[in-house]
Amino acid sequence: MKTWRENMKKILTLLLITFLLNSAFAVIIKAPAVSLTDRGYVGVPINIQINVTKGDGHVFMDTMPLTELDMQGSARIAAKVAGEVTGKDMSKYNVYITVRSDVPVVGGPSAGGTMTIGIICELMNWSLNKHVMMTGTINPDGSIGPVGGILEKIEAAKKANCTIMLIPKGQRYVEVEGNKVDAVEFGKKLGIKVIEVGSIYEAIPYFTNKKIIMKEYPENPLIEEKYKDIMKELSENVLKTANEKYENLSKELSNSYVGYEYQKALLNELTTSKSLLEKANDEYLKNKYYSATCSAFNALIKLETIEHTLKYLTGEEDVKTFLTEVQNKISHDKEIVYSKNVTTNNFEEILAGRIRIAEAEKLLDNAWKSYYLGNYDEAIKYGSFAKLRGDSAIWWVSLKENDNNGKIINEAKLKSLAQQYLDNAETILTYVETLFPNLPTDDLENDLESAKEAYKDGDYLLTIAESIDTCVKAEIPLVIFGDIEYSKKYARNKINLAENLGITPISALGYYEYANSLNDTISKIMYYKYSSYYAQMDIDVIKELNKSISENISSEINIVTNENVNIEETTTKENNVGIMISAIIGGLIGFAGGYLARRVSA
């Protein structure tokens, strides 16, 4: 009995020492929050303690009082971003986050940026400036997202004896009871300097007097040229097909009459397709080959729809026969796509083909639904798009058909990576759903379900692609009012890193080029997101197959310290992010998920 007691004492002593050591070396950081009282909403500071130990990639959270799920989602994303910023492989660490507040607080995602700073400081063993506080959500690309309660949180900073308050870029001006309040001036009256930051990189120097510079990689001119050669050939083929179809349909439509309303509608669509073709031809002449392909592809969708609408109206073809033919064609296209060997040189093209086949099948499902509801016009539109989406799958898997230098990949080796992408998609979607509970996310849930089904079927490339789709669409509300130049630079740098590893990131380069050609903000951000995700996917696949590359990438960060730190303060034009979000947020996911109302990539 005595021996047992002595052993227990030793174990308890070791546990106590471990706890004390962890507490001694923990990072403790304050964050502002909002609490609901009898007098309304008030700002309160909360304490966040962060410990990082060797582990296996878990994030643990202990909160008192209990917080909402959005804070837990923030914590996982914060750990992921901290790993990328510091060059640490977070699958080798566990993160423990303890949150304490004297009063119940409303929500929790606004501490995402703060938690990221805390985890970075723990990983790097850096001390914190206790007089700095920050509010802002953390986005997967490291940008800081908008929050509510800015003025109350500035008051919380005052209560915590802070002198600097960092807020998300674009939130300087806050509307209170119909009046605009300048948060910077509001802070001055409390003795607090309020500064806007757009990314975690901008926030780090204020807390640490150190600056982590995102390592910038140069473009690889040989790979850029290779990409252009591949895309030039594809754009020529698609342009030729689209131009010929336009000429044929122009003659056919001029010789047909299908009633005033239909004739007018079809002529309008023909005019739009002509504009798209002119844009495509212009982009081709400017060496923007992927953009030219996309513009021509969008023209083809309209022309295909005109062709089969005309056949239906003239009695040459019934809708059911058309959809059955499309269904058979997609089945044949799928056989071709899945018959290709996946190699280290073509895995991206095969992935692109598989996701396009999956999209073609979804479009065809919509076509059949429209048909059985008696909406034949919509059925023809979806059917035409489905047919062409199947065509584009074949285009992609044929891009490197003559490149036999790559090693065949055993797709089972990508199972772990596919699980990571699936987990990440689920985390981001849950995060967005808790941040924006009124946001319609049925399309995103369907994308996530498709990713899970692909994983169950052992189709790990498709799992990754469907997961990326979910992530990109889900992130739009998080970054829509962020710095678009940051998204652009982030994507370009990911592409350059892939190129420096000898990868030809065709999808990433294509999406980047396409984003540059677009005018509306939502589309640009969406395709920059696709670009950065696909470049990262290329890097991740190569790392998964060659672990030595992973070690080289992880160690590459640039740190500037002390007197060398030069903090540039920026401010934004007057706007009201909160009002703008509530005005358009409901339409964002519908835009991202909708097939017929947006321009699409080839």
UniProtKB/Swiss-Prot annotation:
Record's keyword terms, sorted: Cell membrane, Membrane, Transmembrane, Transmembrane helix
Transmembrane segments: 11-31, 103-123, 577-597
Major site of localization recorded for this protein: membrane
Source taxon at top rank: Archaea
Protein name listed in UniProt: Uncharacterized protein MJ1318
Location(s) in or outside the cell: Cell membrane
Membrane topology: Multi-pass membrane protein
GO biological process: protein catabolic process; proteolysis
PROSITE patterns membership: LON_PROTEOLYTIC
